[in-house]
From Swiss-Prot:
GO terms assigned for molecular function: DNA binding; protein heterodimerization activity; structural constituent of chromatin
Name of the protein in question: Histone H2A.2
Native organism: Saccharomyces cerevisiae (strain ATCC 204508 / S288c) (Baker's yeast)
PANTHER family reported in the protein's UniProt record: HISTONE H2A (PTHR23430)
Protein's cellular compartments: Nucleus; Chromosome
């Protein structure tokens, strides 16, 4: 068997596998690589950089969608809307820090009432709480 591909004679050629499939990712590694090359971020782009960046983007998207899905379920909805994304991001410390300067259209604000604006406890309820 000199030269040629090893294996059974006459077997069909192995189907090509995308870099996303090789890395076990859903997001497109080839597209991210193309965007890195065309974006003039550097003269040369290594072969591992787009795979790593794609994995990071996929992880962030999955994290945000999971939290937004939980927010939608808490509001008894089956469809994620921008409000659910806003609630998910702003209630998570790390995502809020990462996306602190981002404005989400139709996201609204977090429900928050300042302590001074809440009604004061009456004398009757204050005594009852002290006795307990």
């Amino acid at each position: 068997m000199s030269g040629g591909k090893g294996g059974k004679a006459g077997s069909a050629a192995k189907a090509s596998q995308s870099r996303s499939a090789k890395a076990g990712l859903t997001f497109p590694v080839g597209r991210v690589h193309r965007l890195l090359r065309r974006g003039n971020y550097a003269q040369r782009i290594g072969s591992g950089a787009p795979v790593y960046l794609t994995a990071v983007l996929e992880y962030l998207a999955a994290e945000i969608l999971e939290l937004a899905g939980n927010a939608a379920r808490d509001n008894k909805k089956t469809r994620i809307i921008p409000r659910h994304l806003q609630l998910a991001i702003r209630n998570d410390d790390e995502l809020n820090k990462l996306l602190g300067n981002v404005t989400i259209a139709q996201g609204g604000v977090l429900p928050n009432i300042h302590q001074n604006l809440l009604p004061k406890k009456s004398a009757k309820t204050a005594k009852a709480s002290q006795e307990l």
